[in-house]
C-alpha cells in the first residue's frame, strides 16, 4: 500500500515550509523535524510538560514535532514550539514565564536553528 503522508492541509503546508527553509538556510534540523511530522499520527511525539521541565534548562528553545500535553508541572522559563498544544499545556507554560509558539514562529525568530532542542 502506498504511503500518502498526512492529510491535514495545514500540516502538509508546514512540512513543505520546513523543507524549503532547510534548503534555503542550509540547516538540517528543519528537514529532520519535517520528517518527524510526516510520520503516522500514532507515531508522532506526545510530550507532557513534566518531561520538558525535567530535561530543559531556563531559556532553552524546545521543538516538539507533535503535541504538547498538560500532565505534570513546569517551573522553567522555556520557549516551546510544537505542532499542537493542549489548553492546559499552553496555560502552564505561559504561567511559568515561558512561551508556547508554533514551529513557523520559531523558524522566523531563529532561521538557523541554533540552540534548538528536539524533544520526543
Curated annotation (Swiss-Prot):
GO terms for biological process: translation. One of its GO terms (molecular function) is structural constituent of ribosome. Gene3D superfamilies: 3.100.10.10. One of its GO terms (cellular component) is cytosolic large ribosomal subunit. Belongs to the eukaryotic ribosomal protein eL18 family. Keywords: Ribonucleoprotein, Ribosomal protein. PROSITE patterns: RIBOSOMAL_L18E. This is Large ribosomal subunit protein eL18. It holds the Pfam family Ribosomal_L18. It comes from Pyrococcus abyssi (strain GE5 / Orsay).
